[in-house]
Amino acid sequence: MVHLTGEEKAAVTALWGKVNVXEVGGEALGRLLVVYPWTQRFFESFGDLSSPDAVMSNXKVKAHGKKVLGAFSDGLAHLDNLKSTFAQLSELHCDKLHVDPENFRLLGNVLVCVLAHHFGKEFTPQVQAAYQKVVAGVANALAHKYH
């Protein structure tokens, strides 16, 4: 559960309504793979990830980034019940994919950077603070099934 004030929730919702999920999702996942290259091991089937340019232009990275942000959008609609919303994804990433749960926090922080880049002055410190709460809540929900 994420505790947001009414003002924070309104700010998150208003900005998210302007987000191009395909563009921001692809960029966020791409940046995760470039900035934290050890995360690439989970995406070996995506083809060429040999350079930052290759990662950022990889169609499979972009498509999966869009999928990730689609799930994030679902989370925004269920901020009061994130553990339930992400239960299946948590189980998949824990039991089948064996993803280090720290990667969820890293991706959340990269997403905040990408949003700041895309929205500039509109991404005020107050909006950032609200999004930091949201990405932390999502990361915690995704890590819930880990022992």
UniProtKB/Swiss-Prot annotation:
Domain named Globin: residues: 3-147
Q: Which residues carry this modification: N6-acetyllysine?
A: K60, K83, K145
CDD domains recorded for this chain?
Hb-beta-like
Binding positions for heme b per the UniProt entry:
H64, H93
- GO-annotated molecular function: haptoglobin binding; heme binding; hemoglobin alpha binding; metal ion binding; organic acid binding; oxygen binding; oxygen carrier activity; peroxidase activity
GO BP, sorted A to Z: hydrogen peroxide catabolic process
Positions modified as N-acetylvaline? V2
Modified sites of kind Phosphothreonine: T13
> Which Pfam family, an example, fits this chain?
Globin
GO cellular component entries: blood microparticle; haptoglobin-hemoglobin complex; hemoglobin complex
The free-text tissue note of the record is: Red blood cells.
Keyword terms, alphabetized: Acetylation, Heme, Iron, Metal-binding, Oxygen transport, Phosphoprotein, S-nitrosylation, Transport
**Where, per the database record, does this protein carry Phosphoserine?**
S45
- The S-nitrosocysteine modification is found at C94
Q: Note the PANTHER family from the entry.
A: HEMOGLOBIN FAMILY MEMBER, HEMOGLOBIN SUBUNIT BETA
Q: Which family does it belong to?
A: Belongs to the globin family.
Q: What does this protein do?
A: Involved in oxygen transport from the lung to the various peripheral tissues.
How would you summarize the oligomeric state and partners of this protein? Heterotetramer of two alpha chains and two beta chains.
This protein is called what? Hemoglobin subunit beta
Q: Which organism is it from?
A: Cheracebus torquatus
Q: What is the lineage of its organism?
A: Eukaryota, Metazoa, Chordata, Craniata, Vertebrata
